[in-house]
Amino acid sequence: MTGTPDVFPPATPGGTPLVALPAGPRKPDQVKGKLYIKTHGCQMNEYDSAKMADVLAASDGLELTDSPDDADVILVNTCSIREKAQEKVFSQLGVWKSLKNKGREVIIGVGGCVASQEGEAIIKRAPFVDLVFGPQTLHRLPELIRARREQKRPQVDISFPEIEKFDRLPEPRADGASAFVSIMEGCSKYCSFCVVPYTRGTEVSRPFEDVVVEVAQLAAQGVREINLLGQNVNAYRGPYGDGEFADLGLLIRTIAEIDGVGRIRFTTSHPLEFSDSLIDAFRDVPQLANFLHLPVQAGSDRVLSAMKRGYTALEFKSKIRKLRAVRPDISISSDFIVGFPGETDADFEKTMKLIEDIGFDHSFSFIYSRRPGTPAADLEDTISDAEKHARLSRLQERINAHAAGISEKMVGTVQTVLVEGPSRKNPNELTGKTENMRSVNFPAPARLIGQFVDVVITEALTNSLRARVVAE
């Protein structure tokens, strides 16, 4: 590889667990090569990876492969939330370097948040990398690949062209009964520990009608569950009409009217903007799943203030109380950070108290990871690694125990599941998801795949439920 990387000029400045099926990749009309994509991180990255596949299938005739050894183009879609995830990327790139050493003319590209954060530094650290592109420029992949091949030097484009990428993506293609739909990009909250505003930009909402059209297209292809995505999805303000804006509540109500849409989810939310309008949608829209992922991060007001979260523990509990007034049995999951700089034993106990008060379902919890460039990176860390791990273990044990209790209480109840396909454990059975994100395995005919089915829960296991189909 020769020369220095070309850096595309910046465009107009612009401008996450719970698993769902992403929109399926587009099949090329004529296969001209193989594409391999490795995805790290959140559901937004899963969505973006599916769109990368769609774009390159439409433009370059690339078909997805499960093996990088067979690929003509290899892409890694990265996450920079934690240092460990970031280092995994460079480790993976080192493995792929050997493919080039064998004389293959394979294109290797790095996308996602690490790409946005590191830019040309990736080329300096791994000079065999051909492409570096950000979350907002994945639609430019065909041009980047073409430029790399013609100019014989690496290409870098980590600009923030607002919602241009959505205007240039192919029509969505569904694969399965559930699909992601991104409704906004970026985050403007600037929490002191988080890199997202720096890697994905500030908040930019897609136009209301564009989102509704995409959902309608997916529903027409058999999608029954829509997962609305955004870094701060409940800050959605989609322009529509004559200078008006639609919030997430109105978007949900509109999508629920689309023929075929039987279940709606959204993630990830910020408590600061969990509005009464959204609570009213939970009250009025039966298609809105009886489940909410609402990251709280900590239960100590002092720590929440240091994190720049913008709310208190009491305000968080007040929002949950309002929600449970209209959805008494809703499952609430969350995110927690332990060992944030300056977190005392008393602070941690307040987090444990909040967990008891709310009764969280399955949640995500991590030891604080210092991210360069964030305000929290300059805070003094006086907590030992042993103490951080002890706190994390205790927190996870308590949340897991409560989640297990929720599963046990579901035994004997009738639950509606969206049937996803054959069970991985037993191909003679089917598997599906309940509203509260539990995997359920049950004997049933394959014709039920892609449909909603009522089942009776017969057994609660550690990571799943067993059931039988309710007699028709």
UniProtKB/Swiss-Prot annotation:
Domain Radical SAM core: 173-407
Residue ranges annotated for the TRAM domain, each copy included: 408-471
Broad class of where this protein is predominantly found: cytoplasm
Cellular component terms (Gene Ontology): cytosol
Residues binding [4Fe-4S] cluster 1, per UniProt: 42, 79, 113
Cofactor note: Binds 2 [4Fe-4S] clusters. One cluster is coordinated with 3 cysteines and an exchangeable S-adenosyl-L-methionine.
Keywords: 4Fe-4S, Cytoplasm, Iron, Iron-sulfur, Metal-binding, S-adenosyl-L-methionine, Transferase, tRNA processing
Function: Catalyzes the methylthiolation of N6-(dimethylallyl)adenosine (i(6)A), leading to the formation of 2-methylthio-N6-(dimethylallyl)adenosine (ms(2)i(6)A) at position 37 in tRNAs that read codons beginning with uridine.
Protein name per the record: tRNA-2-methylthio-N(6)-dimethylallyladenosine synthase
Source organism per UniProt: Stenotrophomonas maltophilia (strain R551-3)
